[in-house]
C-alpha cells in the first residue's frame, strides 16, 4: 500500500463531493473510468474497463452493485488545485438504500442520460433522491457519438419530465473521451463546496457511507467527515450501535488505498479499526469521538429491511455446511442480506434468506454458485406479510408454509408498491393489461413525445414472481421499471397447498389472492403432471385451500400386461389376474412413496415464465 503523508487537510472551498446518477447502461461506470484516467488517478497500465466495478459479476452484467468511491486531484483551467471525491452509485432499484446514503455524502450529482435513449424510470427515481438531498445537478448527455443520438430532443425531454434546465448540458462520449475536460470544469464551477458548521475544531461527526470486508485488514469503513478531524489512534464510537473502536489506519482511495494522517471536514476516506463484522457497521450511522462526542447524530439513518424472502437449499445435502460458511462470508460484505436455518420435508436442510429485491436475490444466488461452487435450489420467492390474530396480537409471516390456522387470523396485510413504468407507446396496451391482471391500480398516465410514463400501485406479491420478465417480453426490452414500497394493505389472501398423492409438499405452498387461486392452482397441477414421472400406481396432484380442493390432475399408472400369458381361453382367468393387479396397485397407492425429482421442483417454481 502506497504511503502518502498529508498533515494538512484540504480547504473546504477546494473540495467537491459528487456522485453520478444514471439508469442502468447509460455509461456511468465508463464515465467514472474516463474521469480517473484524465486526472491521472491510475497509471495507464493499471486502468481496466470499469475500474470501480470490482466484482466479476458486476463487470459481467454491466451493473454496479456496491457503491464505490475514488479521490481525484484536478488542476482546473484557473490554475487552482481541487480534490474531487466521486462516489459511484448502483442504478438498480434493489440497491436504492446504497444510492440514498451515497447521495447524502455528496453535495452535487452528475445526471448522465443516454443521448439516444433519453430519460428512463430509474433515472427519475435517482434524480428525485438527489433533489431530496438538495443536490446541485450538472446534466451530462452521453453517447453523442452514436448515429441515433438526438441531444436536442433529449434536452427537451429532461426539461419536460424532470423539470430541470438542460440548456447547458455537457455533451460527451465517455467511450471515446470526448468532452471529459468540460465535465471536470463543470464539476468545479457548478457544484457547491461542502459546508461544515463547526470546522476542524468541532467534535468529530462523520457519516458511515459504506463498509466492506478485506481478508487482510478486516472490515473497512468508508466515511464522509462532516465536522472535526479523524486521525489515526483516535477512539471512535458508532452512535447507532454504541460500539467503540480504536482507529488503526486512515486513508483515501485513488482507487488504490493510500494512507493519510488525518481526514478533515468535507473529505471522504476509509478507516480500519479491527472491526470483526460488517454487521457491526450500520450504513448511514454517525461516527463520533468517544471522549468528545457530537451533540446529535445525523438524520436519515435506517437499517435496510429485507423485502423478499426465499429458501435456498443445497442440491446435495452434504454441501449444507459449505453453504452456511459461504453465506457467512457474503454477509460480511452485504449487511442487507439476512438468513436463518430452515428444514423442508421435500428439500432437506437449507436457509430462509431475506433480500432487498429480486435482482439482489439473483445476484446472491449467482455469487454463491459461482464464487463458492455450490449447486442450489431456490424456492418460490415470497414477501413479508403482516398478520393480525383474533386475540389482537400482531406477527410477521416470512414463509407461507408457516401460516397459522385460518380460524386464528383476523386480517392479512400484504406490501404494496408504487411502480413507475416508462415505455414506447406502441407497447402501452399490453403493459396496462399486465398490470391489471396483477391487481394493479393505475394512478397516472402521461406522454412525453413517443414515450408513455405510467404509474401503478401493485401488490408486491404479484411482482416478485415474474413481472419484470413479462414486462420486458411484452415491450421487446424497451420498457423500464422502478418501484418503491408504499406500505401494507389488507387483502383477501389464502394459502394454497399442493398435495401429491395426498401428501402436502411444503416447498410449493404459497399465499395467493382468492380470485387468482384457481388459475394458479390449475397451472401448478398441470405443470407437475408433466414433470413427475409415472409410477406403478396412479398419483393424484391437487391444489387445495384449507380442506377444499380447487384443482386436480391425475398421473396414470404404469401397467404391466398381466394377461399376456393367457392364450385365448377363459375370460374368468384374465379377470382374476386383473383383479389381483388392481389389489396390488391399491396397496401400493396406500404405502407407495412418490419421488418428486429436483427438476420438477425447479421447473414448478419457475411457474408463469412462458
Curated annotation (Swiss-Prot):
Its EC number is 3.6.5.n1. It catalyses: GTP + H2O = GDP + phosphate + H(+). GO terms for cellular component: plasma membrane. Keywords: Cell inner membrane, Cell membrane, GTP-binding, Hydrolase, Membrane, Nucleotide-binding, Protein biosynthesis. InterPro entries: EF-4, EFG_III/V, EFG_V-like, EFTu-like_2, G_TR_CS, LepA_C_sf, LepA_CTD, LepA_IV. It is a peripheral membrane protein. GTP binds at residues 25-30, 142-145. It comes from the Bacteria. Gene3D superfamilies: 3.30.70.240, Elongation factor 4, C-terminal domain, Elongation Factor G (Translational Gtpase), domain 3, P-loop containing nucleotide triphosphate hydrolases, Translation factors. NCBIfam families: lepA, small_GTP. This is Elongation factor 4.
Amino acid at each position: 500500500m502506497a504511503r502518502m503523508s498529508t498533515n494538512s487537510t484540504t480547504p473546504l472551498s477546494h473540495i467537491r463531493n459528487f456522485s453520478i446518477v444514471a439508469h442502468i447502461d447509460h455509461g456511468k461506470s465508463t464515465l467514472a473510468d474516463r474521469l480517473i484516467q484524465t486526472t491521472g488517478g491510475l497509471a495507464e497500465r493499471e486502468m481496466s474497463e470499469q475500474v470501480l466495478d470490482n466484482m466479476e459479476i458486476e463487470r459481467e452484467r454491466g451493473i454496479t452493485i456496491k457503491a464505490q468511491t475514488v479521490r481525484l486531484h484536478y488542476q482546473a483551467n484557473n490554475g487552482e488545485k481541487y480534490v474531487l471525491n466521486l462516489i459511484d452509485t448502483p442504478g438498480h432499484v434493489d440497491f436504492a438504500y446504497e444510492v440514498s446514503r451515497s447521495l447524502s455524502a455528496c453535495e452535487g450529482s452528475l445526471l448522465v442520460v443516454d443521448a439516444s435513449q433519453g430519460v428512463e424510470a430509474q433515472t427519475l427515481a435517482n434524480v428525485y433522491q438527489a433533489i431530496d438531498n438538495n443536490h446541485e445537478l450538472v446534466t451530462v448527455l452521453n453517447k453523442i457519438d452514436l448515429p441515433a443520438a438526438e441531444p436536442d430532443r433529449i434536452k427537451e425531454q429532461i426539461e419536460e419530465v424532470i423539470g430541470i434546465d438542460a440548456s447547458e448540458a455537457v455533451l460527451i462520449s465517455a467511450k471515446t473521451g470526448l468532452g471529459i475536460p468540460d465535465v471536470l470544469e463543470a464539476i468545479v464551477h457548478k457544484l457547491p463546496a461542502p459546508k461544515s458548521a463547526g470546522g476542524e475544531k468541532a467534535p468529530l461527526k462523520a457519516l458511515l457511507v459504506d463498509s466492506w470486508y478485506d481478508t487482510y485488514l478486516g472490515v473497512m469503513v468508508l466515511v464522509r467527515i462532516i465536522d472535526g478531524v479523524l486521525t489515526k489512534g483516535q477512539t471512535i464510537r458508532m452512535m447507532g450501535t454504541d460500539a467503540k473502536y480504536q482507529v488503526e489506519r486512515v486513508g483515501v482511495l485513488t482507487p488504490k488505498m493510500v494512507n493519510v494522517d488525518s481526514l478533515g471536514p468535507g473529505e471522504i476516506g476509509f478507516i480500519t479499526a479491527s472491526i470483526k463484522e460488517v454487521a457491526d457497521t450500520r450504513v448511514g450511522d454517525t461516527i463520533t469521538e468517544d471522549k468528545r462526542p457530537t451533540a446529535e447524530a445525523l438524520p436519515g439513518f435506517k437499517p435496510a429491511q429485507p423485502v423478499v424472502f426465499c429458501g435456498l437449499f443445497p442440491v446435495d445435502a452434504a454441501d449444507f455446511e459449505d453453504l452456511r460458511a459461504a453465506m457467512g462470508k457474503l454477509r460480511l460484505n452485504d449487511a442487507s442480506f439476512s438468513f436463518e436455518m430452515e428444514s423442508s420435508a421435500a428439500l432437506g436442510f437449507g436457509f430462509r434468506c431475506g433480500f432487498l429485491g429480486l435482482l439482489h436475490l439473483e445476484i446472491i444466488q449467482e455469487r454463491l454458485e459461482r464464487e463458492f461452487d455450490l449447486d442450489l435450489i431456490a424456492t418460490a420467492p415470497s414477501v413479508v406479510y403482516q398478520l393480525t390474530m383474533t386475540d389482537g396480537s400482531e406477527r410477521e409471516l416470512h414463509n407461507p408454509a408457516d401460516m397459522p390456522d385460518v380460524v386464528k387470523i383476523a386480517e392479512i396485510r400484504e406490501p404494496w408498491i408504487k411502480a413507475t413504468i416508462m415505455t414506447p407507446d406502441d407497447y402501452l396496451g399490453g403493459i396496462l393489461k399486465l398490470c391489471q391482471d396483477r391487481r394493479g391500480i393505475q394512478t397516472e398516465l402521461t406522454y412525453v413525445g413517443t414515450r408513455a410514463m405510467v404509474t401503478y400501485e401493485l401488490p408486491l406479491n404479484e411482482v416478485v414472481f415474474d413481472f419484470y420478465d413479462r414486462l420486458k417480453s411484452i415491450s421487446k426490452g424497451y420498457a423500464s421499471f422502478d418501484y418503491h414500497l408504499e406500505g401494507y394493505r389488507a387483502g383477501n389472501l389464502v394459502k394454497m397447498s399442493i398435495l401429491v398423492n395426498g401428501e402436502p409438499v411444503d416447498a410449493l405452498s404459497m399465499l395467493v389472492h382468492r380470485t387468482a387461486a384457481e388459475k394458479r392452482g390449475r397451472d401448478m397441477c398441470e405443470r407437475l403432471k408433466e414433470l413427475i414421472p409415472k409410477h406403478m400406481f396412479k398419483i393424484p396432484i391437487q391444489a387445495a385451500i384449507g380442506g377444499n380442493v380447487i384443482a386436480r390432475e391425475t398421473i396414470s399408472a404404469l401397467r404391466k400386461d398381466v394377461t399376456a400369458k393367457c392364450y385365448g381361453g377363459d375370460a374368468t382367468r384374465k379377470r382374476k389376474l386383473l383383479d389381483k393387479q388392481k389389489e396390488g396397485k391399491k396397496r401400493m397407492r396406500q404405502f407407495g412413496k412418490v419421488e418428486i425429482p429436483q427438476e420438477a421442483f425447479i421447473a414448478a417454481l419457475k411457474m408463469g415464465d412462458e
